Regions:
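Short, surface-exposed acidic
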Residues: 89-104
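Charge-rich, solvent-exposed alpha-helical interaction surfaces
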Residues: 45, 49, 53, 82-86, ...
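Amphipathic alpha-helical interaction segments
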Residues: 57, 61, 90, 94, ...
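A ubiquitous short alpha-helical element
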Residues: 67-73
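Short acidic alpha-helix initiation/capping motifs at coil-to-helix transition points
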Residues: 75-83
Length: 159
């Protein structure tokens, strides 16, 4: 099954988000993490996380980009359990059953988002406030051809 894993090309995420996700952790869309924030409260690093961040599933930090990878069913079961615990501890979910159901819905949403894209491609998210609430847009950046196959210089004999 395809799923998202955080990826970092440079150190910018470390500087722009309140907490940056670790590279290589599974990720969810994470819009739920902004449910209790009003538009006027979005400033600085929190605004950046709101506008362009996926949430990492181990650190609960944010990542600008995710790469599509293959995961197995056990990975997703473990993710459902750990995110269920996170919903109880940080969002006050009233029970383990309700928390794990919410986690399962978030996992399903990410799986659906990933399923039609090629492994190795990248996804980005863009969020904004609208009259109906939070509006999300996703962009797929197709997998680039291997750099090894590209000619980056030419050797010229000198006389």
């Amino acid at each position: 099954m395809k799923f998202a894993r955080t990826i970092r090309f440079d150190k910018s995420d470390l500087n722009i988000f309140p907490v940056a996700a670790e590279e290589g952790e599974l990720a969810l869309v994470g819009t739920f993490s902004f449910n209790n924030i009003q538009n006027e409260d979005l400033k600085g690093k929190v605004k950046q996380a709101f506008s362009n961040g996926f949430i990492g599933c181990s650190s609960f930090g944010y990542s600008t980009l995710v790469s599509l990878v293959t995961v197995n069913e056990d990975d997703l079961i473990n993710l459902q359990y750990s995110f269920g615990q996170y919903f109880i501890e940080h969002y006050g979910a009233p029970s383990k059953i309700i928390a794990e159901k919410a986690a399962s819905e978030e996992i399903k949403f990410m799986s659906e988002l990933c399923k039609d894209h090629e492994l190795g491609s990248l996804l980005s998210v863009s969020r904004e406030w609208s009259e109906e609430g939070i509006k999300e847009k996703f962009r797929n950046l197709p997998k680039a051809d291997s750099c090894a196959e590209q000619k980056i210089w030419t050797v010229v004999d000198e006389d």
